[in-house]
Amino acid sequence: MPNLKFIRDRIQSVKNTKKITEAMRLVAAAKVRRAQEQVIATRPFADALAQVLYNLQNRLQFGEVSLPLLTQREIKTVAVLVVTGDRGLCGGYNANVIKRTEQRIKELKSQGINYKLVLIGRKAVQYFERRNAPIQTKYTELSQIPSASEASTISDELLSLFLSETVDRVELIYTRFLSLISSKPVVQTLLPLTTKGLDTPDDEIFRLVTKGGKFQVEREKVSASVSSFPQDMIFEQDPVQILDSLLPLYLNNQLLRALQESAASELAARMTAMSSASDNAGELIKTLSLSYNKARQAAITQEILEVVAGANAL
């Protein structure tokens, strides 16, 4: 029969662990809400920028404009920007991004294309350093809710690589937020920008709410405004110069939104993992408590038998 003190200590240990996982779940839930607020806060700027670029596109037609960020070159080297986290305890979030990156690298190699890695997050850095992969730049210890200045620093690095023709294309691998229990690693081409113009598709903004004491996600369709400038509007500067200045800003905005979605995905994965850990801890406590009660009952029964046996011997 298990030792009573051992079982009692084990129960206390599991209870302490459950307190930690429950606290981590609540912290992650609060940070998911903050990530949502950041996405909403950047929407007015993103909408206005999309509107300006959309109208400039109609005025100029990108196919007739020669701009560095629109230049299509023969693809010899690709910069792959990989977004992971610095910490674990978030389910398969980091592993899924790394797995998708390995698949993309395999695809590039099969096409005879070289690649350079730009890594965000300690998990990606540790993984690819162990495999001696060609790492161009590493970024760790970013804010849990990425800021515009952090996105700008990374964006400048990518622009430098592309404009210097060190790489001919820039791809981004990040985790798209789908729900609190679902996310998907995706590959997106950042550079060069499409020559057919800038898309303004319907976007989905997620909102974390509580219903019946549980966290749920509401999704809202948001469309960027595309109302036109007056046709007789005169630009003080050459529209091409305006476009040349706004495209890097657009790239930075796209990168910021991808970083924010990745952060939300990581926090949601951590919240789900900690919720599952708390539930498992509760079940383990029940099992250990049952074992403890059985052992205690057996010990009491044994003592009674010994007392009765001693009395009979007298």
From Swiss-Prot:
Pfam families: ATP-synt
Protein's UniProt keywords contain Membrane: yes
GO terms for MF: ATP binding; proton-transporting ATP synthase activity, rotational mechanism
Subcellular location: Cellular thylakoid membrane
Its job: Produces ATP from ADP in the presence of a proton gradient across the membrane. The gamma chain is believed to be important in regulating ATPase activity and the flow of protons through the CF(0) complex.
Annotated NCBIfam families: ATPsyn_F1gamma, PRK05621.1-2
Subunit structure: F-type ATPases have 2 components, CF(1) - the catalytic core - and CF(0) - the membrane proton channel. CF(1) has five subunits: alpha(3), beta(3), gamma(1), delta(1), epsilon(1). CF(0) has three main subunits: a, b and c.
Descriptive protein name: ATP synthase gamma chain
Gene name per UniProt: atpG
